[in-house]
Amino acid sequence: MSGRQRSVAAAVHHQRQLSDNPLDMSSSNGRWLQSTGLQHFQSSANDYGYYAGGQGGGGQAARGYQNAQRGNEFFGEPTTPQYGARPTNQRKNNDESEFSPGLLDLHSFDTELLPEIPVSNQLDGPSLFNPSQGQSFDDFEAYNKQPNRSRVLAENLAAEKERMNAVAKIKVVVRKRPLNKKESTKNEEDIVDTHANCLTVHETKLKVDLTAYVEKHEFVFDAVLDEEVSNDEVYRETVEPVVPLIFQRIKATCFAYGQTGSGKTYTMKPLPLKASRDILRLMHHTYRNQGFQLFVSFFEIYGGKLYDLLSERKKLCMREDGKQQVCIVGLQEYRVSDTDAIMELIERGSATRSTGTTGANEESSRSHAILQLAIKKSVEGNQSKPPRLVGKLSFIDLAGSERGADTTDNDKQTRLEGAEINKSLLALKECIRALDNDQGHIPFRGSKLTEVLRDSFMGNSRTVMISCISPSSGSCEHTLNTLRYADRVKSLSKGNASKKDVSSSTMNLRESTKIPLSSALPTPSNFDDDVNEMWTEENDEFDASDYEQDKQMWKKNGKLEPSYNGMAQERIPKPTIQMKSRDMPRPDMKKSNSDDNLNALLQEEEDLVNAHRKQVEDTMNIVKEEMNLLVEADQPGNQLDGYISRLNTILSQKAAGILQLQNRLAHFQKRLREHNVLVSTTGY
């Protein structure tokens, strides 16, 4: 037995020397064994009984060489031939210049069967390479020096990691808040049921005969949090998994979306502080002495303009660099090293943020607030250079979306703010839709908000969306719009299962087409507003494929199917609704004109403020010139004619500047009156 082991060890040692070019051999396995002096290896392999009888010695030696490379044991089923073994009569032994197909198959099988190797049980049983049987650890060198094995394992792990990252690129979480006092006073009911990562909305509708019925809408997301979930659990579910990734050159973003008063600010407020604690802990322990630094910045987007919340609302400018990366010029960043400083900065910025009272919420956020935690690393050996950005974690508290019907008691300025908010949210939705459809052009420049969020959806990024919904029956339409919006975002994540509501949403569209007056019976005074509002929301969900399917239902044998049963009233309005869908460009044209007017008003406002600022600067220069003139007038021997001439010139300059500013102001007032924005002209 010891002689047989020595012969096998010698065979393995000799094969290791030839492993650099294992295919450079003769096709005749018997001649190959003779040339290497391994004639006795054939009998040794037969004694182990690993191959079935009748096989040639060359095939057995090749199998022994394969198992020597893999480090497998020669125990198990002794009479069972290995899968894929070829008889010797199929091998080409005539021409010595040709390779043996058996040896070529060994290498292909080696790569194919690699994941099936039971590594954990390598040293169990009577293995030929077990050191307890008298052999040294040098015999393992042939097994350890296998670049193909490690390369395949590395490629498999990299591919698996890439697949996991692709699935988790965008995570959508829905949070349901409890009923508030205002909703409880109105006796509104909770119409949202949550279970695991699913939720169901029970929408109450009316048929044509005013019979009430309940329609269920089911949605599936990555996580659904009910009203009992605390902010700590929200953080563990949403932000905590992405915090370690920002040290790996990844930009992560967490933003909250929902109607005004749905709890977005309440949800987002504690998340940055909790994330900063974890970041500092990683910097001080896991990445200690690696030069990482934490910087905090806080700004808002109000009325299409950027303001620094940590520098007394200083106005900022957004620019793009040569790499098409968004840069905010003038944004103040504060380096922090403890959570107390971060808490102070967050409280100071939150107190400066623009808020207002609307018909739907007494403390509504009227701006999009962006808090950024940037990880930077100092340049080694050169402390004079600024640190380079490694990763970034952004928290975006979006302003609440609102409908025109909810803002009837708001003033003109609040309505103007709401129009700008809805415009930016619509631009964000268009970007998400373009990404979902794999379009070549993504309209990120539709608003300032989408420009800021560009790096959140492009490149190596991670995004967490928290959709906040209200459970009350009075906010059912808002809730469904928010959930459909979140489902659109979720569709960006490849391989997701959040398409559960596709069939129900298609049924909802058909149902609304059948009974257009089932949702409500508006009064004549509000009918036009409700129709415009209905088309604003329905146009986003309209699909030509659904129309074609409905068209097949209308027709039977090339004609409209006559029916005089109880469903006749539901079939009659369909052509009317279809005629309205043909007129869809009209509301789009009206909406585009409204956006153009809004942009023009905002631009004129900015021009007026800049003109006023320039007038103040010119006035200060004129005042300095007047003071110098008075000093010269007090000097003895001053010429009176020169004093009068210079004074006349100064007064003319002052009058011309004031007149020009008054004309610009009067023109701007006229434009505001045309668009019914100014409530009164008091104070002008």
From Swiss-Prot:
The entry's cellular-component GO terms read:
microtubule
Signal peptide positions are none
Q: Which residues form the Kinesin motor domain?
A: 169-492
| Start and end residues of each stretch annotated as Disordered | 1-31, 71-103, 574-594
Coiled-coil-forming residues are 596-626
Which Gene Ontology terms describe the biological processes this protein takes part in? microtubule-based movement; regulation of cell wall organization or biogenesis
Homology family: Belongs to the TRAFAC class myosin-kinesin ATPase superfamily. Kinesin family. KIN-13 subfamily.
- Which PANTHER family does UniProt cross-reference here? KINESIN-LIKE PROTEIN KIN-13B (PTHR47971:SF9), KINESIN-RELATED PROTEIN 6 (PTHR47971)
Record note on disruption phenotype:
Enlarged petals and leaves.
Summary of the function given for this chain in its UniProt record: Acts redundantly with KIN13A to modulate cell wall synthesis and cell expansion via the THE1 pathway.
Answer yes or no on keyword Nucleotide-binding: yes
* UniProt-recorded name of the protein: Kinesin-like protein KIN-13B
Q: Where does ATP bind?
A: 258-265
**From which source organism is this entry?**
Arabidopsis thaliana
Compositionally biased region (Polar residues) = 18-31, 79-91
Give the SMART domains listed for this entry. Answer: KISc (SM00129)
Protein origin, superkingdom: Eukaryota
